[in-house]
Every structure is written in structure tokens, then in C-alpha cells.
């Protein structure tokens, strides 16, 4: 009896601890969801031209069509012309795409966490993870991850508000802080702060507890990591432009200094990011194409922006105009090819890993390949049968026409008037 009472007390204590962990996690998740919704609402409010509200459109950071020659500390000074050249930055459409794409991905993250909370609330899931309530919720997102995500989205909202008031230097500084926080958020969300072997074992153990939980922390989580990687890649490239914006509006620089700074910063961050993806994050999510897709999108945006910028302000470059233009195209082209090669290497290594381990994903891929080959064979056979049938029909038609021509030839022979001669 005493042992049974002790077990009941332990059970109640564990259930109470799990209840507290669940409530704390739910509060953090709700705060994260509210922050994301408020950020999306701020974007919409800052995009609408109203008499009351934000003074300016937040995405109109630079306008290359007009050059301001009165202000001195809002751009790059060009001594020979006595004017001011706008700083290299994404134009309005690219800025709108970046912020709204980020908000949409974070809305998906909120939906993912919400579904995870519903699945974790099942009785058999709670019974299986009795005494480790914090662990079951960390399978979706740990409390630290949610906290970093909330701070990151709040800082990005502050960037939107500051941009709407045209405080460019403050916006760049806040964005760089946002970049540092979302980097930690991205790392914790991808790996949960555990070793890759532990990560795989946790996913595998969830298969015997609940199938929906296993799919959520396995396949669905991998999809969310890929979506977040797309956005983070563009965030990384945007950080180099914000860094150039901060330098250009804080110090006296020449025209080409900011362009070179942006290219060098982007190149260094891209190299570090590719190495981290290949040797660290790929241990958790093997097929992580989102990072490369995001980099290609970001480099495409940067390439078009840089080309337009250099073409518009060609006069301000002086004798180094052609060299700077060639350097911009060369650096961006080399890194675009490097990103494509890294993506091919990742695909090859992922396929070799799944083939060596004979995983379910590899089995599904092989089954899909066999189905495609079978369908192609069926199409070829049907095409050959149709071809043979058409040839038979053509031959039959030709034979019938030949017989008809012979009959016509016979009936065309008429009597010429004599008994021995027939005229055609």
C-alpha cells in the first residue's frame, strides 16, 4: 500500500510538472503567434496610403529615378558633380517581396507549432512522455527557439516602422540586430540544440507513439526548415545591403566603396552559410534545397539591382566604371555557379546517404523511378502499336486503291471496231 501511494504521488507530481511545462510552452507559442500576426498587420498598414497612420511607404527606401542634390548626409557624396548619389539597395518591389515572403513563412511556422500543440495534447502522447513534458514540446520547437523567433519578428517589425518614418540609419542598425537574432533562431530551429544522432533517434522513437507526431517532427519539420532556409538566405543578402547602407550614411565614402563592401560582405556570408549548410545543418535535414533556392533568388535580386544601379550612375564612377562593372558581374556570376554546384553536391550526398542506409525515402524514390519507367514503357508500346496499326491501315488502303486502279484499267479498254484490235 505504501509503495502504491508513493507511486500515485510520483505520478501526480510528474503530471503536475508536465502541466506547468505545457502551460509555459503554450504561453510562449501564443506570444509568438501574436507577434507574427502583429507583424503582418504592420506590413499591411505600412503598405496602405492613408491620411492617418504611417507617414511613408516602408518599401520605398531608394529611388534611382530622382537624385537629391540638396542633402549631404543621406547618400554618397560625389565631389565633382556636387551632388548626392543614392546608396545601393533593393528597389521597392524587391523590398515588398522580401518582407511579405518572410511574414508568410512565419505564419506557416505558427501553423506548424499550433498543430504540434494539438498533437502533443493527446492522452496517449502525454502518457508516453510522462515526466518529460518539456521534451515532447521541444520536438516541435524549444522554448528558447520560440523566444528567439518572437524577438526576431519583433525586431523586423521595428525595422518596418522605422523605414516608414524614413530613419534609414536606425533601420539598418535594427536590422543587423535582427539578423543576429534570427541566425540563432534558424540554428536552434534546424537542430533543436541537440546532436544529429539524438535528433534522428527522437524522430524514430515517435513512430511507435503516434504516427501524426512522427510525420510532424519528421517530414513536416523538414519542409519548414526548407521554407525557413529560403527566407534566411534572402535575409543574409539583405544584411549586406543594410550594412552598406549603414556605412554610407555614417561615413564619407566614395561611390565604389559601398558596392565593393556589399559584394565582399555578401561573398563572405555566402561562403560561411554554404559551409554551415553542408557540414552542420545537412546532418539534421539531408535534402535541404531551400537554402540554395533562397540564395539563387537573393543573388538574382542583387544582380538585377546592381546592374541597374551601375547603369544609372555610370557617370559617377569616372575612369573605374568599366572595371567596377566587370567586377560586379564576375563576382555575382562566380557565386551563382558556386551555389548551383553546392546544390548538386548536396543532392548527390543526400542520395548516397539514403542509398547506403536503405531509408524509406530512398525506397519511395526508387519506387517512383520504377513507376516512371513503367509509364514510359507503356507510352512507347502504345505509340509503337499505333504506328503499326497506322502502317497496316496505310498498306490496306494502298492495296485497295491498286485493285481499284486495275479494275479501272480493265474497264477502260474499249473495242475499236475490228475483231482483233482493242484500243485503250
From Swiss-Prot:
The keyword NADP does not apply. It comes from the Viruses. It holds the Pfam family Herpes_glycop. Residues 382-424 are annotated as: Disordered. It is a multi-pass membrane protein. The keyword Transmembrane applies. Its main location: virion. The chain crosses the membrane at residues 24-44, 95-115, 144-164, 167-187, 227-247, 262-282, 284-304, 328-348. Signal peptide: none annotated. Keywords: Disulfide bond, Glycoprotein, Host endosome, Host Golgi apparatus, Host membrane, Host nucleus, Membrane, Transmembrane, Transmembrane helix, Viral envelope protein, Virion. It is found in: Virion membrane; Host Golgi apparatus, Host trans-Golgi network; Host endosome membrane; Host nucleus inner membrane. Residues 1-23, 116-143, 188-226, 283, 349-424 are intravirion. Interacts (via N-terminus) with gN (via N-terminus). The gM-gN heterodimer forms the gCII complex. Belongs to the herpesviridae glycoprotein M family. This is Envelope glycoprotein M. It comes from Gallid herpesvirus 2 (strain Chicken/Md5/ATCC VR-987).
Amino acid at each position: 500500500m505504501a509503495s502504491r501511494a508513493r507511486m500515485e504521488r510520483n505520478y501526480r507530481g510528474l503530471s503536475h510538472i508536465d502541466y506547468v511545462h505545457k502551460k509555459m510552452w503554450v504561453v510562449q507559442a501564443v506570444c509568438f503567434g501574436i507577434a507574427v500576426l502583429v507583424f503582418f498587420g504592420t506590413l499591411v498598414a505600412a503598405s496602405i496610403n492613408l491620411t492617418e497612420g504611417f507617414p511613408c511607404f516602408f518599401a520605398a527606401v531608394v529611388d534611382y529615378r530622382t537624385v537629391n542634390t540638396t542633402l549631404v548626409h543621406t547618400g554618397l557624396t560625389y565631389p565633382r558633380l556636387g551632388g548626392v548619389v543614392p546608396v545601393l539597395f533593393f528597389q521597392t518591389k524587391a523590398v515588398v517581396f522580401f518582407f511579405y515572403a518572410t511574414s508568410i513563412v512565419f505564419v506557416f511556422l505558427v501553423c506548424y507549432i499550433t498543430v504540434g500543440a494539438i498533437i502533443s495534447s493527446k492522452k496517449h502522447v502525454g502518457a508516453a512522455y510522462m515526466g518529460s513534458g518539456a521534451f515532447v514540446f521541444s520536438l516541435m520547437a524549444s522554448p528558447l527557439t520560440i523566444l528567439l523567433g518572437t524577438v526576431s519578428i519583433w525586431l523586423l517589425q521595428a525595422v518596418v516602422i522605422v523605414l516608414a518614418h524614413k530613419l534609414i540609419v536606425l533601420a539598418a542598425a535594427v536590422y543587423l540586430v535582427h539578423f543576429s537574432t534570427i541566425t540563432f533562431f534558424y540554428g536552434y530551429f534546424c537542430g533543436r540544440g541537440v546532436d544529429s544522432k539524438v535528433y534522428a533517434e527522437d524522430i524514430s522513437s515517435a513512430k511507435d507513439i503516434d504516427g501524426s507526431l512522427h510525420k510532424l517532427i519528421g517530414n513536416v519539420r523538414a519542409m519548414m526548415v526548407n521554407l525557413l532556409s529560403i527566407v534566411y538566405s534572402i535575409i543574409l543578402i539583405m544584411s549586406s545591403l543594410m550594412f552598406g547602407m549603414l556605412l554610407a550614411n555614417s561615413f564619407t565614402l566614395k561611390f565604389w566603396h559601398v558596392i565593393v563592401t556589399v559584394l565582399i560582405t555578401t561573398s563572405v556570408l555566402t561562403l560561411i552559410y554554404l559551409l554551415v549548410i553542408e557540414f552542420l545543418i545537412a546532418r539534421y535535414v539531408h535534402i535541404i534545397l531551400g537554402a540554395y533556392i533562397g540564395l539563387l533568388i537573393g543573388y538574382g535580386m542583387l544582380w538585377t539591382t546592381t546592374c541597374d544601379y551601375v547603369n544609372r550612375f555610370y557617370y559617377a564612377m569616372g575612369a573605374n566604371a568599366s572595371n567596377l562593372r566587370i567586377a560586379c558581374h564576375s563576382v555575382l556570376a562566380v557565386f551563382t555557379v558556386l551555389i548551383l554546384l553546392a546544390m548538386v553536391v548536396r543532392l548527390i550526398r543526400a542520395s548516397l546517404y539514403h542509398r547506403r542506409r536503405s531509408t524509406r525515402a530512398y525506397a519511395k524514390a526508387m519506387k517512383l523511378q520504377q513507376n516512371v519507367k513503367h509509364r514510359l514503357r507503356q507510352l512507347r508500346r502504345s505509340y509503337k502499336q499505333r504506328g503499326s496499326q497506322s502502317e497496316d491501315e496505310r498498306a490496306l488502303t494502298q492495296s485497295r486503291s491498286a485493285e481499284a486502279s486495275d479494275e479501272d484499267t480493265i474497264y477502260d479498254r474499249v473495242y475499236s471496231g475490228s475483231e482483233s484490235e482493242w484500243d485503250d
